[in-house]
Amino acid sequence: MTQANRVIIFDTTLRDGEQSPGAAMTKEEKIRVARQLEKLGVDIIEAGFAAASPGDFEAVNAIAKTITKSTVCSLSRAIERDIRQAGEAVAPAPKKRIHTFIATSPIHMEYKLKMKPKQVIEAAVKAVKIAREYTDDVEFSCEDALRSEIDFLAEICGAVIEAGATTINIPDTVGYSIPYKTEEFFRELIVKTPNGGKVVWSAHCHNDLGLAVANSLAALKGGARQVECTVNGLGERAGNASVEEIVMALKVRHDLFGLETGIDTTQIVPSSKLVSTITGYPVQPNKAIVGANAFSHESGIHQDGVLKHRETYEIMSAESVGWATNRLSLGKLSGRNAFKTKLADLGIELESEEALNAAFARFKELADKKREIFDEDLHALVSDEMGSMNAESYKFISQKISTETGEEPRADIVFSIKGEEKRASATGSGPVDAIFKAIESVAQSGATLQIYSVNAVTQGTESQGETSVRLARGNRVVNGQGADTDVLVATAKAYLSALSKLEFSAAKPKAQGSGTI
């Protein structure tokens, strides 16, 4: 592998991915995701937007203190205050980057920035010079680049390269481009930019037309050597380019691209499951690479072919991306050491003995209810327990549901708010409605339920149900998750989890105009 054919994987799940409605994560959840991304082998972890809020600063700083192999990066507007906060946040990281940006399209410069092109160049150069005071690794992004005039882009990119930028990122901020245009754009821009051969060129594509991955691959054909992407394609609006799809496209079609990454592809599925569970965004079954049906064959002809020779209908193996062939994990007789070892095999790290003991206690409870415990059960169980430990405001204790044909169901629920036990009862049009009404009779959150969904964690009637609840209040949207073999218990846990996150998000206001690329 040479530098010329090595693709840098820049993961922005913790920054751009978190901008999905309701996907906000706590500091502890971000650290868990960052650790998994490091195991996955991503080169750059964009840990957040340090200047957006004190909570964001703390999360970026905590990740910078935790990660040792990947580069830790913070996004920053081309504003001195933002850049200095980013520099301070990533300071503890052995490898650090500041990623600063400013809009360059005519419509953004005129209506959003209200700046002339010359002023934009001056601001960009100043930003890069300040960032270089903190690190030699500085990335500059031209927001809305694919709708910018290419001659102006070449001018501003040349100026920031001279000022010390080492990576130039060209975002398709609104997902407007199409692949052949993207490839042409990169080829022309790299040639036109003064000293364009001295930096790494990067693509950051959004999925508004469903072309984020295709455009990212086209950018690589056009000369880019970094792609910015997220696990499961998570991101605002239609999402971002999916890291798993880009990586596997480069691996499976190495004959066409001749490019390499440093990704451990067997960590793709564990990464997908962790991000899905923490954010409350389920992976669609037919999602490429990580969907539950990605390696399923229903056609008899296909099944026969796969049994005779897998490559007849499979262009990659399920094992190569982290799907286990034997997912049966543990049983009721399994001990604490076996449990701990299995979690490590799954890439799950618990921060303390207290957390391990709590998760093991939950495992034993589950083992009494469910004869066979699979990897997916452990992911759901640990995420549910960690959420319970970290979200201190609202905690589930117990509940009783009474239903009879022709009568309204009744929910009697016991939960705690900041350690104080509460009891509530309510009837509803169904048991779920009764649970939510009972909780709200005490919580009085004023939130609106946007989404309620239940997914079976594994196959079979004994499966755990993983429940997601999305609540909205004002301009705040949060997702809550719960898991249990009793889906009504999982439902109550998910609602209480969402209430805790709603309170958490209210306590960490974002900076005005923090922006995105």
From Swiss-Prot:
Main subcellular location: cytoplasm
Domain named Pyruvate carboxyltransferase: residues: 7-269
Keywords per UniProt: Amino-acid biosynthesis, Branched-chain amino acid biosynthesis, Cytoplasm, Leucine biosynthesis, Manganese, Metal-binding, Transferase
EC top class, as a word: transferase
Protein EC: 2.3.3.13
GO biological process, one term: L-leucine biosynthetic process
Cofactor(s) of this protein: Mn(2+)
Region of interest called Regulatory domain, as start-end residue ranges on this chain: 395-517
GO cellular component term of the entry, any: cytosol
Stored InterPro entries: 2-IPM_HCS-like, 2-isopropylmalate_synth_dimer, AIPM/Hcit_synth_CS, Aldolase_TIM, LeuA/HCS_post-cat, LeuA_allosteric_dom_sf, LeuA_bact_synth, PYR_CT
Metabolic or biological pathway, per its Swiss-Prot or TrEMBL entry: Amino-acid biosynthesis; L-leucine biosynthesis; L-leucine from 3-methyl-2-oxobutanoate: step 1/4
Residues at which Mn(2+) binds: D16, H204, H206, N240
GO MF entries: 2-isopropylmalate synthase activity; acetyl-CoA C-acetyltransferase activity; manganese ion binding
Location in the cell: Cytoplasm
Known catalytic reactions: 3-methyl-2-oxobutanoate + acetyl-CoA + H2O = (2S)-2-isopropylmalate + CoA + H(+)
Gene3D superfamilies on file: 1.10.238.260, 3.30.160.270, Aldolase class I
Functional summary from the UniProt entry: Catalyzes the condensation of the acetyl group of acetyl-CoA with 3-methyl-2-oxobutanoate (2-ketoisovalerate) to form 3-carboxy-3-hydroxy-4-methylpentanoate (2-isopropylmalate).
Oligomeric and partner information: Homodimer.
Family the entry assigns: Belongs to the alpha-IPM synthase/homocitrate synthase family. LeuA type 1 subfamily.
UniProt protein name: 2-isopropylmalate synthase
